[in-house]
């Protein structure tokens, strides 16, 4: 996970091979379904191509949508609660369709415990060390989001990724450290791969896939210097960084599915 030359893409390929799958099948299938243009860094998997979208208004609307949660419950709940309720309901309604689509793009479902482990480890650590008033917290990061909002929505509010693609205040130091073995690489890869498996309605839909991928653009853009600096300076916490990135697409997909 600490090989900066291609850690994310390399590990995803290793997971595909370990499960008996073709490491090129995912990128090939998705390139056929999502032809897009643009340059992405070597660390980004080949299926995360940057879409050409003039989406300022879309981003603003989506940002507002992501902050709305009438139920008051986030996608990830502690104590054995539901993890992404939409996924379970979607599979229950049409299991054959979901299985067919996921097989078509060479994906395997992730166990529920993988979602829970990544979510709990990343979000709790970030709240404790950054938003919760710890040593790395700053005055500008406290009390800006209502307590009733979902955990990950609160993180997105503070990170301001839609506007700037990175953390404005102390990007490297704001990340929590010391999770170590709590966040296993296999769990992270399962979550990243399962984004496509769990939400085919979003990622294979011409309208929503562009919004979804456009929101990932700041996290992998070559032009986002602060984000590159953040990755460079957190080699000990690279799994944490990638884990937080995995959380954000899931909340976005969940929001789009309910919009």
From Swiss-Prot:
GO terms for cellular component: acrosomal vesicle; nucleus. InterPro entries: FAM220A (IPR040355), SIPAR (IPR029155). The keyword Lipid metabolism does not apply. Its main location: nucleus. GO terms for biological process: negative regulation of transcription by RNA polymerase II. Pfam families: FAM220. Transmembrane segments: none annotated. This is Protein FAM220A.
